[in-house]
Amino acid sequence: MDRLEMMDFTKFKFLSGLNASPDGSRVVFTVHTMDHENNRYLSNLFLQSSDGTVKQLTDTNEEKASIWLNENALLFPSSRDKDVKDRKEAKHPLTCFYRLKLDSMDVSREFELPLDVSRIEALGNDRYLLLASFDKRMGNTWRITKEDLEKKVEELKEENDYEVLDEIPFWSNGEGFTNKRRTRLFLFDSTKNEITPLTDEFTNVESIQLHPSLGKALLITSSFIDKMSLSNDLHQLDLLSLKLEKISPIEDFLYDFAGYLKDMIVFVGRTKKNYGINENPKIYLTEDEGLSYVKLHDLKHDVYNSVGSDCRYGEGRSFKVDDDYLYFVSTLGHFSNLYRIGLDGILERITAEEGSVDDFDVNGDSVFIIALRQLKLQELYSVKNRDEDQLTSFNSDSLKDKTLSLPEAMVFHNDDVELTGWVMKPAGFDDRKYYPAILNIHGGPKTVYGTVYFHEMQYWANKGFFVFFMNPRGSDGKGDKFADIRGKYGTIDYDDLMIFTDKVLDSYPNIDRFRVGVTGGSYGGYMTNWIIGHTNRFRAAVSQRSIANWTSFFGTSDIGYYFAEDQNTATPWNNHRKLWEHSPLKYADQVQTPTLFIHSEEDYRCWLVEGIQMYTALKYHGVVSKLVMFKGENHDLSRSGKPKHRVRRLKEITEWFERYLR
């Protein structure tokens, strides 16, 4: 068996964008690969047919999504043509759509729109619903000529040196500055080449679900001018009259999803009253006027996939209504599965394997998922009666003949709460030797570690480290009470992590307890900062995309003004002392641990100022420390950053631990 190398992950393939055909016999999806030399990702469409064959549909490396127009035709956006690519690079609002005929493989340009379209839905009769970005500075780009649009783009270049902000949030991680920019709903008539806006310039459309036979659509929206609230609304659109009506059954509510289930509307959301913004949602039913509602199911777990991995790229579906059921992905324990629920309120689990369901689609009896299973990378599966049939082998050779470390579970208790963690032994483990170890802490905090493939941890195991990780209180998968650490950051979660570390060291005597390091990102970075200010037991630390100071986080993060208040039950004005008590920066004068900080310049979730503050504090107090900043990257560097940057990140972390733990 060969040792796993750092660069191996650049050869992995990542799957996303499942879309089943109208008859359910085939499914189209996107395969992403890394082009390390040119520091980019390549994305192309593939088709899985009922006869078991997999066919590549595009090869221009520009296609990430598609919809079915009929059984023989797909519609997809692309910048494959030079004129389109040039205008996109010149910052023109533009999306060009192409039609692909599956029988002949002919591709033709269908239409182009002076909008940056994020989603398209075909209504029939050459009419489409669009979700597209609207920038108030650009104005109504769909109403002016190409010449006038070019002039507008040139005029705005004069504004490149300035950002005028008059609302919060004013930026968003992965998007940049978002002031007075919204996702609006449009109707496009391709026969008339006519675009009609259906929502105003202050409203964000977060999701849309169609019911073509009823001639209606459901929209989840949020409107704001100065400050975005934590509630949103449910609207219904009449596709004939284009009348948009608010039908929110519950006010001051956070709607996650709404769709048509038979002659009822099923919606998923949370009141936030008992457990704040991270409260697990419930499932409800209402009629199409939204005058009353009933709770269909009192879910005890969340409705998203929160299983961590660094081997995904692209987006996945979380909800879909098909025939008599609402299908959704949910995390229970340390893995996610696909579930469904009908009007009778009975909850059924559709998948049975442990791991991670990263995307799915359903059409009648056909169920398709993209999943991580055991220590295998993503593949496409069909599901029937909970049995999974692997349909693709894109990654079958990626880990072939590679040495992998199987995570060994460790269940223990703290404060009468059951907790789970895992330990990975070094490759080529010899019980006569002693090894260094790394504690890895996940982000969130409401996410989970599981037993799926995680490249960085497998790589460290192959470099001769024990690697151990757990789901402390605050994590997902075990209900609201377990996940609720509001006002308790750095207390019970810290205790869980330290007791876990004790138990790992006691259970694995081959770990050299004087050569143990700690790392983590986001919340895991916060906990790394907290840990080094409260104990000197770790010989080295790497803090990634972290939080150091809740007060600065409150005023700079794209989620700061509501997340900091919710998670600390305090603001800088009503209880600044509490924010400071839970800020790692307060304890920086107690740090002795050599610490590396990893931070992206465009991380607007945990802004660069967080890493800089902690780094400066350690330098001020004479602690060995180093800060590596990544230009052009955001909070998702470790998951979707440019290939060369992801390699450099892992190299910096590994070399730091090699230096201080060997």
Specify the residue positions occupied by each region the protein language model found.
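A flexible loop/linker signature enriched in serine peptidases of the S9 family
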Residues: 31-44, 58-64, 78-98, 113-116, ...
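Non-catalytic accessory segments flanking enzyme active sites
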Residues: 17-19, 158, 164-166, 171-172, ...
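Active-site-proximal cap/loop segments of hydrolase catalytic domains
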Residues: 472-662
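Beta-strand-rich domains and repeat architectures in extracellular enzymes and scaffolds
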Residues: 7-43, 206
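Cap/lid segment of the alpha/beta-hydrolase catalytic domain
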Residues: 394-514, 521, 555
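Multi-bladed beta-propeller domains
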Residues: 1-14, 47-64, 88-93, 98-118, ...
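Glycine-rich His-Gly loop
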Residues: 32, 133, 440-444, 600
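Blade-terminus and WD-like Trp-Asp/Gly-His loop motifs, strongest in beta-propeller folds
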Residues: 19-26, 65-73, 120-126, 208-216, ...
